[in-house]
Protein backbone atom coordinates (compact mmCIF):
# COMPACT_ATOMS: atom_id res chain seq x y z
CA UNK A 1 0.00 0.00 0.00
CA UNK A 2 1.05 3.62 -0.39
CA UNK A 3 0.93 3.93 3.39
CA UNK A 4 3.35 1.06 3.92
CA UNK A 5 5.60 2.16 1.05
CA UNK A 6 5.84 5.62 2.61
CA UNK A 7 6.98 4.11 5.90
CA UNK A 8 9.53 1.88 4.14
CA UNK A 9 11.18 5.03 2.75
CA UNK A 10 12.00 6.15 6.29
CA UNK A 11 14.98 3.79 6.28
CA UNK A 12 16.45 5.87 3.43
CA UNK A 13 15.64 9.12 5.24
CA UNK A 14 17.29 7.87 8.44
CA UNK A 15 20.39 6.70 6.57
CA UNK A 16 20.79 10.05 4.84
CA UNK A 17 20.31 11.97 8.07
CA UNK A 18 22.82 9.74 9.86
CA UNK A 19 25.42 10.09 7.09
CA UNK A 20 25.04 13.88 7.02
CA UNK A 21 24.61 14.34 10.79
CA UNK A 22 21.13 15.85 10.43
CA UNK A 23 18.52 15.77 13.20
CA UNK A 24 15.43 13.62 12.84
CA UNK A 25 13.23 16.51 13.96
CA UNK A 26 12.79 19.23 11.35
CA UNK A 27 10.06 21.65 12.42
CA UNK A 28 10.31 23.80 9.28
CA UNK A 29 9.96 20.73 7.06
CA UNK A 30 6.96 19.55 9.08
CA UNK A 31 5.21 22.90 8.62
CA UNK A 32 5.78 22.65 4.86
CA UNK A 33 4.39 19.11 4.82
CA UNK A 34 1.25 20.27 6.66
CA UNK A 35 0.75 23.15 4.22
CA UNK A 36 1.21 20.89 1.19
CA UNK A 37 -1.11 18.24 2.62
CA UNK A 38 -3.84 20.75 3.43
CA UNK A 39 -3.67 22.12 -0.13
CA UNK A 40 -3.80 18.61 -1.61
CA UNK A 41 -6.68 17.74 0.72
CA UNK A 42 -8.66 20.72 -0.61
CA UNK A 43 -7.82 19.75 -4.19
CA UNK A 44 -9.16 16.26 -3.53
CA UNK A 45 -12.38 17.26 -1.79
CA UNK A 46 -11.20 16.55 1.74
CA UNK A 47 -11.69 18.74 4.79
CA UNK A 48 -8.16 20.13 5.27
CA UNK A 49 -8.62 20.37 9.05
CA UNK A 50 -9.58 16.71 9.29
CA UNK A 51 -6.38 15.67 7.53
CA UNK A 52 -4.12 17.30 10.15
CA UNK A 53 -4.23 14.47 12.74
CA UNK A 54 -3.53 11.92 9.99
CA UNK A 55 -0.55 13.86 8.65
CA UNK A 56 0.72 14.36 12.23
CA UNK A 57 0.43 10.61 12.85
CA UNK A 58 2.35 9.87 9.63
CA UNK A 59 5.12 12.24 10.67
CA UNK A 60 5.23 10.83 14.19
CA UNK A 61 5.42 7.25 12.89
CA UNK A 62 8.07 8.32 10.38
CA UNK A 63 10.20 9.81 13.13
CA UNK A 64 9.76 6.71 15.31
CA UNK A 65 11.05 4.55 12.46
CA UNK A 66 14.02 6.86 11.88
CA UNK A 67 14.97 6.94 15.56
CA UNK A 68 14.77 3.15 15.77
CA UNK A 69 16.99 2.70 12.70
CA UNK A 70 19.52 5.17 14.11
CA UNK A 71 19.59 3.26 17.39
CA UNK A 72 20.15 -0.03 15.53
CA UNK A 73 22.93 1.40 13.38
CA UNK A 74 24.68 3.05 16.31
CA UNK A 75 24.83 -0.23 18.22
CA UNK A 76 25.59 -2.44 15.22
CA UNK A 77 26.64 -2.01 11.64
CA UNK A 78 25.87 1.14 9.71
CA UNK A 79 23.70 1.07 6.57
CA UNK A 80 25.30 -0.93 3.77
CA UNK A 81 22.92 0.08 0.99
CA UNK A 82 23.15 2.99 -1.45
CA UNK A 83 21.84 6.12 0.26
CA UNK A 84 19.45 8.23 -1.83
CA UNK A 85 19.57 11.99 -1.61
CA UNK A 86 16.99 13.44 0.72
CA UNK A 87 15.39 15.45 -2.09
CA UNK A 88 14.76 12.31 -4.18
CA UNK A 89 13.30 10.45 -1.22
CA UNK A 90 11.14 13.40 -0.17
CA UNK A 91 9.79 13.72 -3.71
CA UNK A 92 8.68 10.07 -3.56
CA UNK A 93 7.15 10.61 -0.10
CA UNK A 94 5.21 13.60 -1.43
CA UNK A 95 3.93 11.49 -4.34
CA UNK A 96 2.81 8.78 -1.94
CA UNK A 97 1.14 11.31 0.37
CA UNK A 98 -0.78 12.74 -2.59
CA UNK A 99 -1.71 9.25 -3.75
CA UNK A 100 -3.01 8.43 -0.27
CA UNK A 101 -5.15 11.58 -0.19
CA UNK A 102 -6.68 10.68 -3.56
CA UNK A 103 -7.42 7.14 -2.38
CA UNK A 104 -8.86 8.38 0.93
CA UNK A 105 -11.07 10.89 -0.87
CA UNK A 106 -12.35 8.26 -3.30
CA UNK A 107 -13.06 5.84 -0.47
CA UNK A 108 -14.91 8.46 1.58
CA UNK A 109 -17.20 9.19 -1.38
CA UNK A 110 -18.97 5.91 -0.59
CA UNK A 111 -18.85 6.22 3.19
CA UNK A 112 -16.58 6.14 6.20
CA UNK A 113 -13.88 3.55 6.63
CA UNK A 114 -15.41 0.30 7.82
CA UNK A 115 -14.05 -2.08 10.42
CA UNK A 116 -13.15 -4.42 7.55
CA UNK A 117 -11.21 -1.61 5.83
CA UNK A 118 -9.21 -1.02 8.99
CA UNK A 119 -8.52 -4.73 9.46
CA UNK A 120 -7.30 -4.94 5.85
CA UNK A 121 -5.09 -1.88 6.28
CA UNK A 122 -3.63 -3.24 9.52
CA UNK A 123 -2.67 -6.51 7.82
CA UNK A 124 -0.95 -4.63 4.99
CA UNK A 125 0.78 -2.07 7.22
CA UNK A 126 3.89 -3.94 8.23
CA UNK A 127 6.84 -1.57 7.89
CA UNK A 128 9.82 -2.48 10.07
CA UNK A 129 10.34 -0.52 13.29
CA UNK A 130 6.65 0.17 13.87
CA UNK A 131 4.83 -1.56 16.70
CA UNK A 132 1.10 -2.20 17.09
CA UNK A 133 0.60 1.01 19.04
CA UNK A 134 2.29 3.08 16.31
CA UNK A 135 0.09 1.45 13.66
CA UNK A 136 -3.05 1.93 15.75
CA UNK A 137 -2.28 5.64 16.12
CA UNK A 138 -1.99 6.10 12.34
CA UNK A 139 -5.17 4.15 11.62
CA UNK A 140 -7.12 5.99 14.33
CA UNK A 141 -6.07 9.32 12.79
CA UNK A 142 -7.00 8.05 9.33
CA UNK A 143 -10.51 7.30 10.58
CA UNK A 144 -10.92 11.01 11.46
CA UNK A 145 -10.43 12.22 7.87
CA UNK A 146 -13.61 13.65 6.32
CA UNK A 147 -14.68 14.94 2.94
CA UNK A 148 -15.22 18.68 2.61
CA UNK A 149 -18.82 19.88 2.83
State each model region's role.
Residues 4-7, 31, 35, 56-59, ...:
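Generic structural signal for well-ordered, non-transmembrane alpha-helical segments
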Residues 73-110:
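Extended amphipathic alpha-helical interaction segments
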Residues 14, 21, 66, 70, ...:
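Alpha-helical coiled-coil oligomerization motifs
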